[in-house]
Amino acid sequence: MRRLFLSHVLGAWLLLSQLPRELSGQKPDDVIKACGRELARLRIEICGSLSWKKTVLRLEEPGLEAGQPVEIVSSSISKDAEALNTKLGLNSNLPKEQKATLSERQPSWRELLQQPALKDSNLNLEEFEETILKTQSEVEDDSLSELKNLGLDKHSRKKRMIQLSHKCCYWGCTRKELARQC
């Protein structure tokens, strides 16, 4: 009788030990302050735990269930691609190489000047080129400043890790933020 009881207790213990372990009883949004070795151990614990990764993915995408297809390409991009394919389909007598170059080609300034909006304007070539160059430089300046503000300009992964470790040490960070770096 005693052997039977011990074998049942041993069986129950083995079954319970196979269940996923709880992660320190902390929620993913609890703020943790950790520096140096503590932070490294915490990252290893979070990144090494398969159940944590599944939990984070489930928390980040609550509307998705297993088995539901996900649309990766946004609808505006797919609409543009459909329009391009339709235009290329109209020129079906062109060889494949010319179709590829036609889809990748940018219109020249002469073609742009032939459009109705620019035909009526009094822009000469120099003014037109200056306008385009000015617009391009403004866009480049804006994108570069945005990248610098985000910390993604050069060596982005290293800089983000430095910023995250600094933040975790002085102000604290969540498990979810640490899991994103895995």
Curated annotation (Swiss-Prot):
The keyword Signal applies. One of its GO terms (cellular component) is extracellular region. Disulfide bonds join C35-C169, C47-C182, C168-C173. It is found in: Secreted. GO terms for molecular function: hormone activity. The modification Pyrrolidone carboxylic acid is found at Q26, Q163. Residues 1-25 form the signal peptide. Its main location: secreted. PROSITE patterns: INSULIN (PS00262). Keywords: Cleavage on pair of basic residues, Disulfide bond, Hormone, Pyrrolidone carboxylic acid, Secreted, Signal. Heterodimer of a B chain and an A chain linked by two disulfide bonds. Relaxin is an ovarian hormone that acts with estrogen to produce dilatation of the birth canal in many mammals. Belongs to the insulin family. This is Prorelaxin. It comes from Equus caballus (Horse).
